[in-house]
Amino acid sequence: MSEISLTFPDGAVKVFPEGTTPLPVAESISKSLAKKSVSAKLHGAYVGMHDMIPASGDFQLITTSDDEAISLLRHAASHLLAQALKRIPKFANMHFGVGPFIDNGFYYDTDNGAGNQVSVEDFPEIEAMMHKIVKEDLPIVSREITREEALSMFAEDPYKIALISDLPEDEKITIAVQGDHIELDKGGLVPSTGWIKHFKLTSVAGAYWRGKSSNPMMQRIYGVAEWKQADVDAEIQRREEAKERDHRTIGRDMDLFFTSQEVGSGLPVWLPNGATIRRQVERYIIDKELANGYQHVYTPVLSNLNLYKTSGHWDHYREDMFPPMDMGEGEFLELRPMNCPSHIMVFNHKPRSYRELPIRIAELGMMHRYEKSGALTGLSRVREMTLNDGHTFVEPEKLEEEFKSILTMMMGVYRDFNITDYRFRLSYRDPENTEKYFDDDDMWEKSQAQLKRAMDDLKLDYYEAEGEAAFYGPKLDVQTKTALGSEETMSTIQLDFLLPERFNLTYIGADGQDNHRPVMLHRGIVGTMERFTAYLIEMYKGAFPTWLSPLQVQIIPVNLGAHGDYANDIQAQLQAAGLRAHVETKDAKMGYLIREAQTNKIPYTLVLGDSEVDGQTVTVRKYGEEKTRTMRFADFQSEILADVANYSRPVND
């Protein structure tokens, strides 16, 4: 009998009969391992627990303890959902798009035609059918089929036919079979439906097929799947909290911004309250950059297309750019997708000396990205954005010093915005796949070592990620945890050795020769104003610190006739001091007006009655506090100004 030889991660080699599946392999090691084994890998490709191991090679068992195992469970849960829908008569003729796992869950895109759309009211029936299939404990088996077989098998589902038709002619096509249900699948599932015990359907939303608005609108059914019910419950609770923090909901409730089809998808309109928050962020960041030696500029939002051909954006980034505008006579203008070529023009508009370096150029630069309709979300994914952008041109030997300077400024900004949950990622090129990166081995080795040394000098913890570098140089990414639990890149410092070559940037060195090449550092401290404001809205849950709050002081006279003049005088003094204050003139009960101020999350509410007018005092109620304080107005003004000046942190922080 023929045999196969399997090499395990610890280097051990075992021989098994040809035709063996991963399950007896796991059992040969231990029964407990077999019970925990979710799937297997041969040379990095998934092999189901009931599938034949096709050849000898490097072999690994995936258990419930492995991080990737939860993704396999969630992927299988999407298949379970589809199988359950097909068993319910009113959904029996449903068509299916794609059903992947995602962070914290899964979804499946479905199309049931004009009638019998899925609603949340259907979820109990669908979940009951899913649990029934779980009890059947159907083995999940993969097998390879021909293209002709696949087209015949899925002939009634136009979406599956489209997926099959898009595959290269020589692509292997595999299916996953569980009882009466068949899925197009490349592998990576649990052994049987009995493993998918703990799940919950959460929502249904519209989604264009393949994210294009010209394609049919499908229904995307979302769900959660975990190994334990307690984890499902925790995820549902987290999502309820997420709804309360969703910047789109808070933005609507607090009149911060809106989006509309009349204006255009992905083009948010900033209302006065939201514009005030954004303006405070912009003023803050400009002042911070000016204090750190940056020169602020304004550059056009439109540029000659040739600029982006020289930079390489047109070749590598064209799908994310809007079509060029033909101005006639061979001139084409392009909405810029990035600011760096414009800042290179600022550097290059006159000869530069080493004595001027580093030259730090910054801008709140408006950019445009051709985002698909299906990807657009509130402020966080838009088509027009303003980036807190900066570029430094530095001598190669001063690179490390400049990197540390940028990072120190960045951490100061995080402190002022009370951003504490983040980690640093040093992103290097992939040493096993160097051909996709800028071709200079010496540069890569030196620059990666410089970034690592700078982080060590600053005594900052970081992790290293090979293969995450940009093609033109290594970078530092700051990964922040959002209030909704996801991780995003907020800030970045990227080394660029390529664009200075493409644009032939030089400076005059100490030797008097104008042939020295600077290194370019791209850096973004808070990213785009849109995404950063969305982050702040969700982090603060709309209860902004005083310095950022759209309205800082709500003044409520007990009687507008008797106390209105004093209220207006207080407002005038606060506004003269640079504060944002408003006198409430509505005719309503005092309790209602105070509650409304608290609902609107205004940091300070002042109540003015006879005693306050007579004593030139104010009665102060701070947001989130039940107690009130009566104090001299001058003392209150000093307190709130100190609050603003200290970015609303405790004075001794």
UniProtKB/Swiss-Prot annotation:
It is an enzyme of class 6 (ligase). One of its GO terms (biological process) is threonyl-tRNA aminoacylation. One of its GO terms (molecular function) is metal ion binding. The keyword Lyase does not apply. Disulfide bonds: none annotated. It catalyses: tRNA(Thr) + L-threonine + ATP = L-threonyl-tRNA(Thr) + AMP + diphosphate + H(+). Catalyzes the attachment of threonine to tRNA(Thr) in a two-step reaction: L-threonine is first activated by ATP to form Thr-AMP and then transferred to the acceptor end of tRNA(Thr). Also edits incorrectly charged L-seryl-tRNA(Thr). Homodimer. This is Threonine--tRNA ligase. It comes from Leuconostoc citreum (strain KM20). The gene is thrS.
